[in-house]
Each structure stands twice: as C-alpha cells, then as structure tokens.
Amino acid sequence: MKYGFIGTGCMGGALATACAKAIGPEDILLSNRSPEKAQALAEKLGAIPADNETITRDCDVIFLGVKPQTMAQMLLPLQPILTGRRTPFVLVSMAAGVAIEALQDMAGGRYPVVRIMPNTACAVGAGMTTYTCSAEVTDRQRQTVLDALAASGLLEEIEEGLMGSASAVALSLIHISEPTRRTPIS
C-alpha cells in the first residue's frame, strides 16, 4: 500500500508526519509545488520525494493538501492519469469548503473521496479530524485511510453537510470526552 501527499504545507505536512508514525515512512510519497519543501520533509520523515504525476499514478491513498482555490488547477493535468488507472485508489481532501461532488468534478470522475477537516495538532497526535466519505468509498478504503490517520489523534465521522461546522463539532467532541479522560473508571 502506498500513500501520497500532494501538498506538504502546514496541514499536509502535519498529516504526512502523523501517517509516517502510524504506518511507517517507507511507503509515503511527498510532493509540493516547491520541490525543496517536499524533499526536506521526506528527509526528515524517511519518506520519498516525488511529483504529482508519480503520486497520482502509483499511490493507493492520495492526500490532497492544496488550497481550495488551487485544487481545480492542480487536478486538471492529473485527470488523464486518474482516468487511466486500473487499480483502486482513494482521494483524501483536506480542502476547506470543497464538497465531495465538486472535488469529483475537478478530478474528472466519480472516484472514491474521503473529505477530512483536520487541525495542525495532528502532527503530534493531539488532533481532532472529522471526516465524511463519498458513496464510492469501500469499507476497506475507509479503514485504510483511518489506519493512516490513527496517529493523528481523534477521528470522527460526520455528515458532509456538517463539514462547514467541523471545527465547532470537533471542539464539542473534545469537550464531551474531556471529563471521561480526567475521571478514572472504578
């Protein structure tokens, strides 16, 4: 299983770091519009620097860590690669405000998509990530993504309609779970 991160800025880098802790760095490929940034993170984690095309062609799980306003531009040249794939893959988007259907349109097909709303505390295992899956995501793909994110902190599935409120939902869940973390069970 190979995991690719297109975009290794604050959020993409934090999730790549968590993923490396969860599954090991040897099957993680990293790319960034500034190749030096991907190279530096790859060296730090023990991962593999790559380009967007290689990640799109070779990875089973493709994390999209680019800004919402550049997502369509980034995906356009990758559409032929996605269309030509014969092996299963899942796209994982952390772009705020980009709905699953819109992302599928940008990618050029009704591909499996997991939409996530993480925070940067994911890098140290103290994050709260809400997620939602498109109908095309299989149970195995869902579990693979969750396993990759396991070291990032808490994970909570919510309806896509709530993704715009994901930060508030995450904070509420943290507050709800806080008393149980402080109160020992007898």
Region roles according to the model:
Residues M1, E26, A47, F89, ...:
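A structural micro-motif
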Residues M1-R57, A126-G127:
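NAD(P)+-binding Rossmann beta1-loop-alpha1 motif at the extreme N-terminus of oxidoreductases
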Residues C10, E36-K37, Q69-T70, V98, ...:
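Short alpha-helical
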Residues L15, P35, K44-L45, E53-R57, ...:
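Rossmann-like NAD(P)(H) cofactor-binding subdomain of soluble oxidoreductases
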Residues L29, C122-E157, A166-S172:
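Short beta-strand and adjoining strand-loop segment in the mid-core
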Residues L103-R110, L154-G164:
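Short, hydrophobic/aliphatic alpha-helical segments
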Residues H175-S186:
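Single conserved hydrophobic/aromatic residue that forms the stacking wall/gate
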